[in-house]
Amino acid sequence: MAIVRQTLVYQGPGGPFEGVIAYEDEVTTLRPGVLVLPNVLGQKEADNVHAENLAKLGYVALAADVYGQGKRTRHGPEAGIYMAELNADRALLRDRLAASLDALKGFDRVDPARLAAIGFCFGGKCVLDMARAGLPILGGVSFHGVYDRPDYANADPIRAKLLVCHGWEDPIAPPEKTVALAQELT
């Protein structure tokens, strides 16, 4: 079997968006889908590699784009410009996450009833926001995420199973924010 990696352009608020989807070429049954959500730098090669690695495990994975086609950043002072726009409008972020999930769900090799999301830093925040918004993911993993709550009401109850991988001394999410997240999700 070979892993296929292809660009997937999809629509959403403020789009179009350009992600990369990866899957095994010989699989004929519908597979679980995993949305890979990027850090502050946005969709990039490292996310595509994560998608390929998930495809090797039998998933269909979409390295999502939440900033918009052609909006890419690099390390340095401008790195957070697009993230700051979405942090200021969490409802827009939620809607872009929903559009990314819809793109994954609509891919012809994905079982739309078996969806999950993983994310790194800002992407970890995105995973938590998907669960908070009640988007149809069965589970999510936040790696060193950002834990501040959005300004919209959480789904009640949050149905997605969540794994939060976090370093206690992380300056972006200090212990008191980690405790607040635990209280929120309990």
Task: Describe each model-derived feature in a short phrase.
Residues 1-186:
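N-terminal cap/leader regions of alpha/beta-hydrolase-fold enzymes
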